[in-house]
Amino acid sequence: SLDVYLNETTRHADVILPAPSTLTRTHYDISFTALACRNVARFSPPSLPAAEGERAQSQTLLRLAAVAIGNGMSAETLDDLVAAELARQLVADTQSRVAGRAPEELLAAAEPLRLEDRLLDMMLRAGPYGDGLGSFPDGLNLRMLEAHPHGIDLGPLQPRLPEVLRTPSGRVELAPAQLLADVPRLVEALRRPSNGLRLVGRRDLRSNNSWMHNIEPMVKGRNRCTLQVNPADADRLGLVHGAPARVQSAAGSVEAETEVTDAIRAGVVSLPHGWGHDRPDTRIGIARAHAGVNSNLLTDEVPIDPLSGTAVLNGIPVTVVPA
């Protein structure tokens, strides 16, 4: 495992390789830029220098991948292969600004960059606002973003449909045959009377992910790992706000503090995911002091969604009684 914590997941690893601080590496937000209300591009250099002898996370990942591939491949060779494959894909994409160019041109333009910075530079050049290897002199590349540390505002969002669609019809296919074929099963399930309670998950602003539970400012204050219950259900079941309740499913049971609230509808109870930090073979002291309960213990491995084949993690049938 590559992690800064010995937690409930990494305890299963034979070796845990420590990851350096995120403040010691460059950053370009790809995921959340897709949620922005304007087109922006921003590159952040490392805020802190890496410790002597410390390897970048990407270097470690490349070394592990090279070992898995075998043949004596080095991390540096694999880095070059990844970059070459990306260059090939970008010049083959008819929508990119480097379409039809030689992959070697794109690789040469990104020199002497390595690792993720090289990949980023090539993607910027090929993207809809890129320099297109000089075809658009005012377009983006990594060097330009480094010269604008506060980022570049590229203007309002632009329509991209149907340009980016890759469906056979060239349209947004909202009713594929597989989905329509599954509708009768869904309708029949909705008509069946619902007996008992259904368990759903939730997130809290200060604990979106489990690693946040090992940071004191994120977990201080009220208990956030509670079982939310509608007042009508609480009265019917004899549950008291602040008192423990036992939640039982076909797979297992947990005990959690009851939170009576009208924020959840009758017939439904809610436990947040990512808690249950009471394992003795971990080293996350702050999280253990705010352990909560592991809602995964209530999920059954047998039921799956027939259409997608994924596990059922919401809408789990449960019973709840005072603990």
Role assignments for model-derived ranges:
Residues T10-A13, P159-L161, T167-P168, P193-N195, ...:
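Short, well-ordered loop/turn elements at secondary-structure boundaries
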Residues Q89-P217:
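Long, low-complexity segments enriched in small/aliphatic residues
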Residues Y5, S21-T22, A66, E146, ...:
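A broadly conserved detector of short glycine/acidic/proline-rich loop/turn motifs that flank catalytic sites
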Residues V40, P162-V164, R171, G196-R198, ...:
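A residue-level signal for beta-strand positions that form part of recognition/binding surfaces
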Residues L2-E8:
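Short, polar loop motifs at secondary-structure junctions
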Residues T9-T10, T26-Y28, A51, A175-P176, ...:
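Short helix/loop capping segments that flank catalytic or ligand/cofactor-binding pockets
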Residues P45-A50, E54-G127, S210-Q228, A232-A323:
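Long, contiguous, secondary-structure-rich segments that constitute the structural scaffold
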Residues E8-F43:
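Flexible glycine/proline-rich, aromatic-decorated loop/lid segments
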